[in-house]
């Protein structure tokens, strides 16, 4: 297996009730940037998505976001990231993220995060868990 160049992160559009979740997202963004690994995520500037993206940028990393047009119109996109891909639907967002990322990390989130993570497990059939 070659070097990992990009990692997708599925996580919540809210920070949640446990401050440790935001700390973990921040640390993940920092570690990815320090390792020279591009972050691929849902393109939002809010919630854990925003935390991980801003941490990667702050640490000198490259960040690619993929966001559906309807969320762009709601002004939740982070337009200050390295590159932002606008797609037509949530389904297309997931497809593009799978194309752009070599692997995925799943952080806390809601039903969308659960759906994305389950799809990843089914498609790639490989996973590891860390505590």
Q: What spans do the regions from the language model cover?
A:
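Hydrophobic acceptor-binding patch used for acceptor engagement in glycosyltransferases
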Residues: 104
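Short Gly/Thr/Asp-enriched flexible loops that form oxyanion-binding sites at enzyme active sites
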Residues: 50-55, 116-127
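N-terminal glycine-rich "phosphate-gripper" loop used for MgATP/nucleotide binding
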Residues: 87, 109-111
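A cross-family phosphate/adenosyl-ligand binding-site feature
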Residues: 1-100
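Glycine/threonine-rich flexible loop motifs
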Residues: 17-20, 111-118
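Short, acidic/small-residue loops that bind anionic groups at enzyme active sites
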Residues: 67, 107, 121-131
